[in-house]
């Protein structure tokens, strides 16, 4: 398995959840939530530099039928823009089906989530966004370890 930090982003309409791996590429760790809009790609680029990430994983919300819907097209467009901004760092699209649901189910059992949830919906959504990015990245790392192949689809225009 390849070593080196990977960064995962789970882009949504309003926010982007971010997670990173440890340097050995074994464990995914939540990082932060970025507000969508001007400067979001710059913030991700800064995180790539800060963590010396070797690759960025972008969540791709394929439908359960496998068809590319509106959200999947938006994720692909975001990944292409990110790939242009981050070149030569590779960007990969990885299936994120049900990551947010999985993240929320895991979080609901934790006391810290309930405490954060008491502060309001915005804080809770921020935690969920980071957790979804963490689930996405952990799934990608586990897939690579199992298959011995990089996960997902390399975004056009990346090395």
From Swiss-Prot:
It is an enzyme of class 3 (hydrolase). Its EC number is 3.1.-.-. It is found in: Cytoplasm. GO terms for cellular component: cytosol. GO terms for molecular function: nuclease activity. It comes from the Bacteria. CDD domains: YqgF (cd16964). SUPFAM superfamilies: Ribonuclease H-like (SSF53098). Keywords: Cytoplasm, Hydrolase, Nuclease, Ribosome biogenesis. GO terms for biological process: rRNA 5'-end processing. InterPro entries: RNaseH-like_sf, YqgF, YqgF/RNaseH-like_dom, YqgF/RNaseH-like_dom_sf. Gene3D superfamilies: YqgF/RNase H-like domain. Could be a nuclease involved in processing of the 5'-end of pre-16S rRNA. Belongs to the YqgF nuclease family. NCBIfam families: RNAse_H_YqgF (TIGR00250). This is Putative pre-16S rRNA nuclease. It comes from Thermobifida fusca (strain YX).
